[in-house]
Amino acid sequence: MELSLSTLFDSEILSDLTIEFVDNHTKSKVHFHKNILYLGCSYFRSMFNRFSESNSREIVIKVPDVNASIDIIKYFYGIETTNDYWKYVLNTYVCKKFFGLETEFPANITVVSDDIEEFLDFIDKMGYDDNTLKLIAKNIPESYNLQTFPKYFIKTLFRVLDTKYLILVFGHEIILVDINGTTYKSIKFDTSIKGACHIQNTNKIAYRTDNIIRVYDFEENKIVFEKKNSYTHRICSANGKLFIGDNSRVEEINPINGESYRFFRSTYDEKIILEVFYDNEFIIVFGQPHVHSLRIKTLICFYDMKMGGKIRSFYYDGNVDMLEYCPVNKCMFFCENHKKTGKIYRVCFYDSSIKIFTRKELVYESKYSKIIKIIWISTKCSLIFCCENGTIGTYCIMTNETKILTDINDKIKDAVLIKHNILAILSPNTVHIIDINKCGDNANINKFNVSSDIVKIMSTSSINTKLANKISDLLDDIDDESDDDSDDDIITTKN
C-alpha cells in the first residue's frame, strides 16, 4: 500500500527537525522534514543555508500566529485547510508574508458587528495601509460610534471611502480614470461590449459581450465569474445587487458567484427596460411604449425586491425614455423625448399601496433639444437634467423651482454624478467636470480630452456609501480650530 506525503506531517518517521512555534498567546511543537521545508519556501531555504540551523534538530520560531503558521506548512505536505473566519484569514495572510510566500490581501473579508472591536484592534497591530483601511471602511457598520476615533483617522478613512473613478466604456474596452483624466485601470476585450454597469458598494463591474455576462473586480484585476446568457437586453445594479432584463422577465444574479436566485416575470410581451430603486426596496420595470386605445402609453410595473411579487402596474400616459424615483413626497420623474425636444413630468403616488395619482405635472420643457440624462440627488432633494445641446439645469422639489446651472457649449452624450455635488459630462471628445453648487462659468471646474468612441460614462461608488455619508456629515460638524491636528501624519497609506 502506498502512503501519501501527508502521512509524514508531524510524524517522527524520517523526521530530522522539531520546530516549536511561539506567538504572544500559545506555543506548539511539530515534527518536520528539512527537505520538504526547504522546497516549500524561501524562509526555510535561507534558514538551512546557515550552519547552525542546518545542523540543529530543534529550533524555536516566533511567528505572528501559531495555528496559521502550522496550517501553511501543512500545505507543503499536501494538506489543505479551509477556514473563512476573518481572524484566521488575516492571520494566514500575515504568516504567509512572514514566510516569504506570494499571497494576495484578502480584500473580501466580512466581519460581523459583534467582532468589530476585536477586528479594529487586530488591524491596529497589523498596521495601516490602503488594503487595511479599505477593509475597515467596508466592514464598519453604519451604527458604529465614529467619534471614538481621532479626527485624523476619520479623515483618512473618509479619503479611502471617497475615492471614486469614472468608468469610460468603448466598443472593446473599459477604462477607469480619476476626475483629472489620469488612467487607473484599462480592461480590453476581444468582442464588443453590449452593456455595462458598476455594481454599487463594490469594486466590481458587470458587462455583457455577445451571449456572456461577466463580473470583473478592478481592484483584484480578475474575472469573478462569467455566465452564458443569450437573451439579456439590459443589466443594472442597485445597493450591491445585480439585475438583468430580457423580453419577459427580470432576473437577480448573485454578483459573487453568478447564481440566479430571483425572477420577476412580466406579462408585457415587448422588450422591457429595467430601472432599480432600493430606497423602498422595489424595482420598477417599464416597457417600450405602444398604442393603447389610440394613445401612446407605457406600462410601469412595481415589483417587491424581497418577496419577488408584483405590487402594482399601471399605464403611463405617454412615452417614457427615462425615469427617476424620488422618495421625497413619493413621486417619480418621467422624461419624454421627441425629435428635437424633451419634457420632464412629475407623477406622485402613495408608497404604501403604490396608488398613482392621475395628475401629470410638467416641471421642465426643453424646446430645442432632447434631454439626455436625469439624475435624482437625494441630499439636495433636486433633479439634475442634462440636455443634448449642452444645457444643464436643476429642479428643486421642495421649492418647485427650475433653474439653468450652466451651458457647456458642447453636445452632451451622457452624464453621471460622481459625488453629491460633482457631475461628469461626456461630450464627443471631452469629459467636463461640473460643480452643481455653482452657476455659469464657475460651475466648470475641470475638463479633459477623451476618445470620440466612448459610448457611456459611469462612476464607481464608495465601498460603503452609508458610512461615507455619515463621516461626511460628521466632518462638517467638527470644529477644526478646536482640534489638534498634530497627529495627522500618523496614518500613512501605501499605493
Swiss-Prot record:
User: Which parts form a coiled-coil structure per UniProt?
Assistant: none
Q: Which SUPFAM superfamilies match?
A: POZ domain, Tricorn protease domain 2
Give start and end of each BTB domain: 15-85
Q: Which Pfam families would you find in this protein's record?
A: BTB
What family is it from? Belongs to the mimivirus BTB/WD family.
Q: This protein is called what?
A: Putative BTB/POZ domain-containing protein L98
Give the classification, highest ranks.
Viruses, Varidnaviria, Bamfordvirae, Nucleocytoviricota, Megaviricetes
